[in-house]
């Protein structure tokens, strides 16, 4: 049978999602826990790979197994073997046609940014940080240039393995509460470091170092060297994929309510 799981994790302690020889990735920890619970090896596929230091509020994975357990047992049993900064939120049986990556209609991320003259303390590692004020309207105007289908080569890491740099951004929203900014992104898919590179450019515009129209110049250049430096992973959260409602999978986890705004 095929199962889908939703899980959340604090990415600070891990070298990203994808399995590595070190074993210090979220995928490695999850597969070890699943194998311990099911008493057999299990290989997972995820909806979206996250980089080192990036957090997940609702990563979705699927796997095939002959082990029969109640769905609630898959949640509680797997969590028993997981470290405290990773937790399975739900489990659901799906048909063999479901694919955590291939069935996703879009993917959603949020970036939480602290604007303060003093560096983060209690939220260190969970938020990005700027000490110069940001101008919201300028950032909104800059973000508008990125909406729709474009070649995002200028925002692509050199190590990116995507077959095409052409992606479609469906939504970018910017909001602020107190000292905290929240940037939401939704696209059909994202390139390696794409959001962190966009964040670097938005901050350059927000602080007045560049004009809003500079974002279009960066986009059209199709050259990573013309964009701002890659911003910190600390405040980046994978909110999860969107699927067709017919799959019956949750779109939220309780961790959503923890994020500001």
Model-found features: residue ranges?
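Structured-RNA-binding interfaces characteristic of tRNA pseudouridine synthases
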Residues: 1-261
């Amino acid at each position: 049978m095929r199962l889908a799981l939703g899980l959340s994790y604090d990415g600070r302690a891990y070298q990203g999602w994808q399995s590595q020889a070190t074993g210090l990735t979220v995928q490695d920890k999850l597969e070890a826990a699943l194998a311990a619970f099911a008493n057999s090896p299990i290989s997972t596929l995820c909806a979206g790979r996250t980089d080192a230091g990036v957090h997940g509020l609702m990563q979705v994975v699927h796997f095939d197994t002959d082990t029969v357990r109640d769905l609630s047992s898959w949640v509680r049993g797997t969590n028993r073997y997981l470290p405290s900064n990773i937790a399975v939120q739900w489990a659901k049986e799906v048909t063999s046609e479901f694919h955590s990556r291939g069935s996703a209609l879009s993917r959603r991320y949020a970036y939480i940014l602290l604007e303060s003259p003093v560096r983060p303390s209690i939220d260190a590692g969970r938020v990005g940080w700027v000490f110069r004020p940001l101008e919201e309207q300028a950032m909104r105007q800059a973000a508008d240039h990125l909406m729709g289908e474009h070649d995002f080569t200028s925002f692509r890491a050199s190590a990116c393995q995507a077959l095409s740099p052409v992606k479609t951004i469906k939504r970018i929203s910017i909001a602020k509460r107190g000292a905290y900014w929240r940037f939401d992104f939704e696209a059909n898919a994202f390139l390696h470091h794409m959001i962190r590179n966009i964040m670097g450019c938005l901050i350059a515009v927000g602080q007045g170092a560049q004009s809003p129209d500079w974002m279009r110049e960066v986009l059209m250049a199709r050259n990573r060297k013309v964009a701002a430096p890659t911003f910190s992973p600390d405040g980046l959260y994978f909110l999860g994929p969107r699927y067709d409602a017919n799959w019956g999978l949750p779109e939220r986890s309780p961790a959503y309510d923890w994020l500001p705004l």
